[in-house]
């Protein structure tokens, strides 16, 4: 189950953080200031979780900004404050472009990067090539929308990213997961209440089986 359902998240967490386990929990949904939903039709695939977000939004509209990154106009996208309808398969470029803008605006968390990360220079060299104009054209979105979402990562506190099979079930899924985690590491949006990269499991016990060592290479 874990190998078929969300193996990209497994590999992405392990490569980026050294351990296969989301550094977030469901309670973070109640405390995030920004919820970025990428590659997930949460309204239909995780309805209980999505209703939890909407109830909070309805109770205090200014407390939460919902961003949806999805080529499709899903029910999830219809409820978003910002919908980035990127061209299919371009979300890794989008994440690199957002990281580029965080760096350009000096929005990186220098202290966090120095204390808790490594290989910053190679990452810097990659994302600096993904300029806003290049990314906007590649993804098929307005450049202003790209800038608006990138600003949320360094101008707002408590950014929580959530994804599921739209990211995981693809050839470059692990790279996209790492790109998202890198964006959180760059901006220091991790390891604090209401912030972090949060993979949503697609099937029952996809996480529990891994926690119990139920993967072939761990037996």
Model-predicted segments: where are they?
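Cofactor-pocket helix-loop regions in the catalytic cores of large enzyme subunits
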Residues: 1-205, 209-211
